[in-house]
């Protein structure tokens, strides 16, 4: 019997990771599970249910010209109201890059600024709206499974409390009221349903899962920051962690030493950029080879390509690659940097820039950015150490310009979230 890409990724990575569900979609799916679960946030029991919302009226209002006028007038008074709401909804759209064609309403998702903007995938089948998986393929189900199965009860409760603060039940803002009204005009499950994919997730009980839980706990602890910063980081951290995890577990499956990811933060050294390009190619190749070994000749190249594509697409979406196509290499985008800082630090704490680069980026995430990490990764045999010193300096400048790094009079460099408040 042939193996599909979901069969392969469940065995290799623990859950369903597909190129069509890559990027920000795992984070969105995670939030759907968190907010739509009838048994509360991150239930310990397996027999939980979900009430899923399609938000089809608002999504069709934004992208579907065939939405009947009489349906629109049941909610919106006139054309002026319709135009105003459509412009607002456009501002709430999740930005999805690398789409050549114009997005249909089925591929249009809202960024979850408030709990009533959360919605599942849906499509128009005949004259009926059908709620189903299209882009929320299972990456978020794996993340949800890892979080709710945490055996550290203190950390689990902190994460639960963090989600409660992020999306309060009693929120009463104009945006929440509007989103709730529009969502109420769309389809939802008539009765709570059980998810089929989440229970099939496999735990490895390793340090990678601990890394994801710790990072999520830290992100949610930053109650001093605007909620949108935390929500964005929850989504980004889920994607970043999936990249870290796929890179590590592919090497493990092949019986090879885990690969360090080389980041070009300076953009001025051709040798470093080429090394980062080779590093990316090697990582993608290992994902493909590991998937091929798992399939053992029982899968098509198309299915194996979906596994490989999920890795690169997620890395590009969360800001870890310089571009979606062409000559690609690892970089640290601004959103990725902010997310990495929030995931590293708990609450209003701080850490030295040197320890952030070595203890967090390198030892925890396997990201090589500076001289010390390059030396530990045995890269200085082939590189002049000044290249990584300049790379580290440029990373520090980038973080300083965004307010994530403060340089004191004694030249001490400290990482914190102070400027984001």
Language-model regions, residue ranges each:
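Intrinsically disordered, low-complexity regions
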Residues: 5-14, 27-32, 54, 58, ...
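Phenylalanine-focused residue identity feature
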Residues: 12-13, 24, 31-33, 48, ...
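Alpha-helix boundary/N-cap detector
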Residues: 3, 7, 25, 45-52, ...
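Charged, amphipathic alpha-helical stretches
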Residues: 1-98
């Amino acid at each position: 019997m042939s193996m599909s890409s979901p069969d392969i990724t469940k065995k290799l990575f623990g859950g369903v990771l597909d190129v069509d569900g890559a990027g920000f979609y795992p984070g969105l799916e995670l939030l759907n599970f968190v907010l739509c679960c009838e048994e509360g946030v991150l239930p310990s029991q397996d027999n939980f249910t979900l009430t899923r919302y399609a938000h089809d009226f608002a999504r069709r209002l934004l992208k579907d010209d065939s939405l009947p006028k009489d349906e629109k007038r049941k909610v919106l008074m006139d054309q002026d109201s319709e135009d105003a709401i459509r412009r607002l909804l456009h501002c709430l759209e999740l930005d999805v890059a690398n789409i050549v064609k114009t997005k249909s309403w089925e591929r249009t998702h809202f960024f979850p600024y408030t709990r009533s903007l959360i919605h599942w995938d849906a499509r128009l089948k005949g004259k009926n709206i059908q709620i189903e998986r299209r882009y929320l393929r299972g990456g978020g189900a794996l993340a949800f499974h890892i979080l709710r199965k945490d055996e550290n009860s203190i950390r689990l409760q902190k994460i639960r409390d963090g989600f409660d603060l992020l999306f309060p039940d009693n929120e009463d803002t104009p945006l929440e009221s509007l989103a709730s009204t529009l969502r109420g005009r769309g389809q939802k499950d008539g009765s709570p349903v059980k998810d089929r994919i989440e229970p099939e997730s496999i735990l490895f009980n390793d340090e990678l899962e601990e890394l994801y839980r710790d990072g999520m706990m830290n992100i949610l602890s930053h109650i001093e920051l605007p909620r949108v910063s935390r929500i964005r980081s929850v989504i980004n951290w889920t994607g970043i962690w999936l990249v870290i995890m796929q890179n590590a577990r592919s090497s493990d499956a092949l019986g090879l030493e885990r690969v360090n990811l080389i980041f070009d933060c300076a953009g001025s050294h051709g040798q470093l950029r080429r090394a980062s390009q080779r590093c990316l190619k090697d990582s993608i190749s290992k994902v493909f080879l590991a998937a091929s070994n798992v399939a053992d000749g029982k899968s098509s190249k198309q299915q194996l390509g979906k596994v490989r594509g999920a890795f690169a697409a997620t890395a590009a979406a969360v800001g870890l690659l310089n571009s979606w196509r062409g000559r690609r290499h690892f970089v640290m985008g601004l959103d990725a940097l902010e997310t990495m800082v929030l995931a590293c630090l708990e609450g209003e704490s701080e850490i030295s820039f040197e320890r952030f680069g070595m203890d967090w980026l390198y030892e925890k995430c396997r990201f090589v950015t500076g001289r010390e990490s390059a030396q530990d990764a045995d890269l200085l045999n082939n590189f002049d150490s000044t290249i990584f010193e300049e790379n580290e300096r440029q990373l520090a400048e980038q973080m300083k310009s965004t307010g994530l790094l403060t340089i004191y009079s004694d030249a001490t460099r400290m990482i914190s979230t102070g400027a984001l408040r």
